[in-house]
């Protein structure tokens, strides 16, 4: 016998979290719980405003439609909404024992705030020093100077940069001008520096700064291929789709010599712990990009190891639908 429950959550965000054009005040979504033959599985469905094509309401409706069919014994097709497809596929993988428990809780820390404090923190990091800097929010020249200072001050640091397609080619060149050519090989990659993929490829060729595809991975017709200057693809499962789709992309990337990086879409601690398990399972040699836990004021049901943040319990959540 199959039973299914959909729980709704709304967690307060820390002040100052801005996504493109709006301030994000709460993180909204659903936990899906599947039970069959004494086994159970869970997943998180949490479309990200400004980035997901679906709203939370649309995701909830699609999840209920899928759960109704599954509860009656059908094997419904994957939802066309990426956040729903991903969350349900995680629940099915747990239910069927296909999602390993071991996890990669390493994080590439997100660098923001006072550069002097950052340098101290980065120098004190143990193990492989990989960090991330969001760029493109301020002047390109300023971004270049900050990146250069970090690379100069921490000699064993490797940086992942993310520009979210925010620059013209001229602005991207302004950034590169302020990064010492001797340090550029320690930029692991710069995600989508320019507004078009052609401009980004030309930027990589002309500057020697490696790039990665992020938004492009979710564009219709995207093919994983080896290209000069491209070193990685970034996979954000909540925005991409089911585990099967993520596996397909990771396999294709590895087959052509590209790194595949599992990255957060500001999931709750519940979703982040599942992403850490997926990263350990599918991309064990790569540090995932999961340093977003502290953007939300509370954890959700499952704790992130070592975090002392308060936890919202399952019995505090509203039931959106139950079979």
From Swiss-Prot:
Cofactor: a divalent metal cation
Pfam families to which the protein is assigned, alphabetical: MenC_N, MR_MLE_C
UniProt keyword terms in alphabetical order: Lyase, Magnesium, Menaquinone biosynthesis, Metal-binding
Listed SUPFAM superfamilies: Enolase C-terminal domain-like, Enolase N-terminal domain-like
Record's keyword annotation contains Lyase: yes
Catalytic function, reaction form: (1R,6R)-6-hydroxy-2-succinyl-cyclohexa-2,4-diene-1-carboxylate = 2-succinylbenzoate + H2O
Coiled-coil regions listed: none
GO molecular function, one term: magnesium ion binding
GO BP field: menaquinone biosynthetic process
Chain residues that bind Mg(2+): 162, 191, 214
Enzyme Commission number, as recorded: 4.2.1.113
Active site annotation, chain numbering: 134, 236
Pathway(s) per entry: Quinol/quinone metabolism; 1,4-dihydroxy-2-naphthoate biosynthesis; 1,4-dihydroxy-2-naphthoate from chorismate: step 4/7; Quinol/quinone metabolism; menaquinone biosynthesis
CDD domains the UniProt entry points to: OSBS
SMART domains found in the cross-reference section: MR_MLE
Domain of life assignment: Bacteria
Claim: Protein biosynthesis is one of the keywords in the record: no
Cited function: Converts 2-succinyl-6-hydroxy-2,4-cyclohexadiene-1-carboxylate (SHCHC) to 2-succinylbenzoate (OSB).
Family the entry assigns: Belongs to the mandelate racemase/muconate lactonizing enzyme family. MenC type 1 subfamily.
UniProt protein name: o-succinylbenzoate synthase
Source organism of the structure: Photorhabdus laumondii subsp. laumondii (strain DSM 15139 / CIP 105565 / TT01)
């Amino acid at each position: 016998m199959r039973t299914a429950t959909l729980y709704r959550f709304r967690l307060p965000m820390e002040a100052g979290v801005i996504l493109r054009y709006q301030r994000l005040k709460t993180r909204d979504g659903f936990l899906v719980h599947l039970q069959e033959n004494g086994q159970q599985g869970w997943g998180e469905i949490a479309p990200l405003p400004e980035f997901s094509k679906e709203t939370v309401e649309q995701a909830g409706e699609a999840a209920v439609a899928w759960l109704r069919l599954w509860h009656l014994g059908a094997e419904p097709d994957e939802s066309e909404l990426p956040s729903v497809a991903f969350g349900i596929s995680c629940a099915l993988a747990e239910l069927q024992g296909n999602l390993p428990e071991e996890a990669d809780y390493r994080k590439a820390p997100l660098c923001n705030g006072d550069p002097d404090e950052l340098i101290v923190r980065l120098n004190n990091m143990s193990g492989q020093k990989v960090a991330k800097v969001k760029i493109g929010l301020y002047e390109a020249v300023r971004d270049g100077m900050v990146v250069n200072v970090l690379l100069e001050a921490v000699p064993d640091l490797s940086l992942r940069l993310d520009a979210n397609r925010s620059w013209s080619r001229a602005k991207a060149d302004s950034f590169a001008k302020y990064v010492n050519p001797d340090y550029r090989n320690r930029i692991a990659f710069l995600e989508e520096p320019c507004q078009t993929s052609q401009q980004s490829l030309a930027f990589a060729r002309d500057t020697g700064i490696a790039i990665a595809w992020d938004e492009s991975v979710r564009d219709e017709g995207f093919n994983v291929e080896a290209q000069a200057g491209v070193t990685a693809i970034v996979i954000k499962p909540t925005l991409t789709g089911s585990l099967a789709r993520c596996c397909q992309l990771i396999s294709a990337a590895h087959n052509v010599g590209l790194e595949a990086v599992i990255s957060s879409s500001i999931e709750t601690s519940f979703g982040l712990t599942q992403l850490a398990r997926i990263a350990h399972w599918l991309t064990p040699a790569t540090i995932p990009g999961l340093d977003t836990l502290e953007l939300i004021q509370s954890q959700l049901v499952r704790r992130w190891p070592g975090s002392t943040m308060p936890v919202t319990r399952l019995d505090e959540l509203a039931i959106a639908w139950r079979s």
